[in-house]
């Protein structure tokens, strides 16, 4: 038996405590708002076909999506512009079991913007 196996229960309990704190923070936020918006990633999309060689950097690209996943909340990403001809995304997070709010917001957003129609230069339309 390795040390990790001996502490599995303690790690699991601690992870559940952290998850509960994250969920509580979202519950507090949703008492004042219908949706929460964040960037989807820290920057623009990667070049097509490129793979990051640094797993930590790849993990950090998902940083903004982790909290919604841990809290069990619905979330989606919408096109929200571009940087150097590479798309950037807007993440919309909804309250627990409230997918209609993020879908309605996404529809409203796309009727007011045209980012969903953007095709990067060099891509087929």
Task: Go through each PLM region and give its residues.
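Serine-dependent amide/ester hydrolase catalytic core
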Residues: 4-70, 119-124
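Structural helix-boundary/capping segments
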Residues: 4-24, 70-125
């Amino acid at each position: 038996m390795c040390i990790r196996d001996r502490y599995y229960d303690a790690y699991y309990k601690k992870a559940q405590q952290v998850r509960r704190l994250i969920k509580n923070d979202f519950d507090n936020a949703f008492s004042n708002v219908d949706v929460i918006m964040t960037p989807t990633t820290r920057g623009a999309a990667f070049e097509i076909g490129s793979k990051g060689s640094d797993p930590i950097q790849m993990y950090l690209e998902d940083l903004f999506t982790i909290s919604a996943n841990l809290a069990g909340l619905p979330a989606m990403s919408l096109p929200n512009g571009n940087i150097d001809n590479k798309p950037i995304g807007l993440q919309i997070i909804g309250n627990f079991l409230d997918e209609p709010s993020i879908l309605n917001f996404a529809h409203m957003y796309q009727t007011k913007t045209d980012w969903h129609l953007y095709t990067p230069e060099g891509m087929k339309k």
